[in-house]
Amino acid sequence: LDKLDIHNLKMLQERGGAVRKMILRAELPEDLQKDIILAYKELSSSYSSENTDVAVRSSATAEDLPNASFAGQQETFLNIREEQNVLEAVKKCFASLFTNRAIVYRQEMGFDHLKVGLSAGIQKMVRSDLASSGVMFSCDTESGFGDVVLINASYGLGENVVLGRVEPDQYYVFETTLKKGFS
């Protein structure tokens, strides 16, 4: 991505696409594949299922910083089931570190593309039609105040909150109050 002109759409698409293809064509290390499959089997077993539906979510090291949010820059894959599909979704998460949108955002914010790491989390999909889902932050995103947990939630998939498709309910949980036993 050296000397990439992010305002040259053709160059951005070619280079971003080339990096994503390299990641998707590569094999995950065997020990990582085994660990993912074992964890997926254990998760499925804990729900008395052979192949439970999961969300494969990305989490980058540069997300939710005081001066850069990175929210929504990488991909999440929902309702994934079966071992091979989980492994492919993990690779797609890794490749999503190099979507055109993510490349542009990092470059505009002054981040080195190769110094941002990414992990993939695998979570059980829940019945969002029977409850709510959303996004939780470990501080107030407006002020940076660190003694609260901020939760944005709505009925349906949490992705609807992340993508701004719904107007979520907003909850502030004051940690000091909880620690004193008040609820």
Label each PLM-derived region with a short phrase:
Residues 1-121:
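N-terminal beta-alpha lobe that positions the nucleotide/phosphoryl donor
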